[in-house]
Amino acid sequence: MTKITNDLFLKAARKEQVDRIPVWYMRQAGRSQPEYRKLKEKYSLFEITHQPEICAYVTKLPVDQYGVDAAILYKDIMTPLPGMGVDVEIKSGIGPVIHNPIRTFQDVEKLTIFKPEIEVPYVLDTIKLLADDMLDVPLIGFAGAPFTLASYMIEGGPSKNYHQTKSFMYREPEVWAILMEKLGRMTANYLIAQINAGASAVQLFDSWVGALSRADYAQYIRPVIEMIVKEVKAVHPTTPIIMQAVGASHLLAEWETMPLDVVGVDWRETITTARQKVPTKAIQGNLDPSTLLAPEKCIAETERILQEGILEPGYIFNLGHGVFPEVPPEMLKKLTKYIHERSEILLKKG
């Protein structure tokens, strides 16, 4: 396995002192890069992720081009679902489309047991390739969290208000619990397999869970997240686990009492107030990705965020959501350089 010579990200995830703030960007690998767009002329997303050499190349690009302090595996949160019998297609301009959406108990019952080594060996091969030969920074594996996966599976695709998902949850609580159990087992096994293959940390993407109230989260979602985190920690107790959601500041207190290591926040919450809600966790975030298209605003916001981030150990610079396709790669390169240089100065000042 390649020795990790830049462990700033892992130190920050453990709330240890660092000499500069680590940075990586959600969706740093992919759609904003010319090299990736050229690949997409020939291959679909799933075709790229099924070819370890190509997928590893895409994953490593931002490390080489931007100088980020961590790589995140290039794949989609939908990747494991076909292994459970879900007929999913990624449609250009739309996103994931489910051709056999969940509507009844029978639909949930049909979901099959997911075995990562059998269903997604190409994901594990990509991780091994990166960890063994290609990276000197930590590699982050990830999975979609059960609520977000269920929202696609029930709605049949992207949704603005998740009313089909929430009404199913309210109307069929026992069936919902079975669905969460199946997705939770899949997610735990998937994350454990990624760490076994060489991932240094893992992130749970619960992109749409902010649509729920805190009371609904505590009743319908918290049990499965606790199960996932506890199962991963039982096998890999020192591997950092990150929780990332959008528009979910009202749920921060729920995550404070779980054995998570890092909590991602978006631009709706400041780093300072987030720390008050999750004092035992490292914080990741929280630049609005829209500012990447407005350079002066981007630098001003980055400076403000860094001033808050350096006040305590355990801060990782990131976006509050993914990089937009329109963002020039040069902007991410310049921003990374600014974060590294500026944070080093600020930390020396103390």
Swiss-Prot record:
CDD domains per the UniProt record, alphabetical: URO-D
Enzyme Commission numbers on file: 4.1.1.37
Positions of substrate binding: 27-31, 46, 76, 152, 207, 321
Catalytic activity: uroporphyrinogen III + 4 H(+) = coproporphyrinogen III + 4 CO2
GO CC entries: cytosol
UniProt cross-references to PROSITE patterns, sorted A to Z: UROD_1 (PS00906), UROD_2 (PS00907)
Site (described: Transition state stabilizer): 76
InterPro entries named among the record's database cross-references: UROD/MetE-like_sf, Uroporphyrinogen_deCO2ase_HemE, Uroporphyrinogen_deCOase
An example Gene Ontology molecular-function term: uroporphyrinogen decarboxylase activity
Subunit structure comment from the entry: Homodimer.
NCBIfam families per UniProt: hemE
Protein name (database record): Uroporphyrinogen decarboxylase
Organism this protein belongs to: Listeria innocua serovar 6a (strain ATCC BAA-680 / CLIP 11262)
Lineage, top ranks: Bacteria, Bacillati, Bacillota, Bacilli, Bacillales
